[in-house]
A protein has these predicted regions:
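Nucleic acid-binding interface residues in structured DNA/RNA-binding domains
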Residues: 1-117
Length: 117
C-alpha cells in the first residue's frame, strides 16, 4: 500500500470515531493492516487536509496521552465529556471506542479479522 492510500484509510477510520470516544494510533494502524505504522498514522493526521474536517483530537496514544504540543486537544475532548485520570491521560477504560459494532457497516472490516479488539 502506498502512502496516499494509507493516509486515505487513516482518514476514513478517523472520521468514524464517535463523539465522546477516543481511538489510538496503534489501533488505526492495526485496522489498516500495518500495526507497526502507528507513528505514520500520527503523521497522516498532521497532514490531514482541513476540508476533511477530521476529529483528529479523538486520536491518542495507547496510554491515553495527548499530543504534547497541541493544547486545544484536551479542551476539545473535555467538551465531549471525555474524562482524564490524575496523570493527565484519557480514561481509556471509559472512553476507548468499541468498534466491534462499526467494523462491517461503517469501516468495511470483518469482525473476524479484528480479533485483537
Amino acid at each position: 500500500m502506498d502512502r496516499e492510500q494509507f493516509y486515505k484509510e487513516v482518514y476514513s477510520i478517523t472520521k468514524e470515531i464517535p463523539y465522546g470516544n477516543v481511538f489510538t494510533y496503534g489501533k488505526i494502524a492495526q485496522l489498516i493492516g500495518n500495526p507497526q505504522y502507528s507513528r505514520m498514522v500520527g503523521q497522516a493526521l498532521s497532514y490531514a487536509p482541513k476540508e476533511e474536517d477530521l476529529p483528529c483530537h479523538r486520536v491518542v496514544n495507547s496510554q491515553g496521552r495527548l499530543v504534547p504540543s497541541w493544547q486545544k486537544q484536551k479542551e476539545l475532548l473535555e467538551k465531549e465529556g471525555i474524562t482524564f485520570k490524575r496523570n493527565g491521560c484519557v480514561n481509556m477504560s471509559k472512553h476507548l471506542w468499541d468498534i466491534t459494532g462499526s467494523l462491517t457497516s461503517t469501516i468495511g472490516i470483518s469482525p473476524t479479522s479484528a480479533t485483537w479488539l
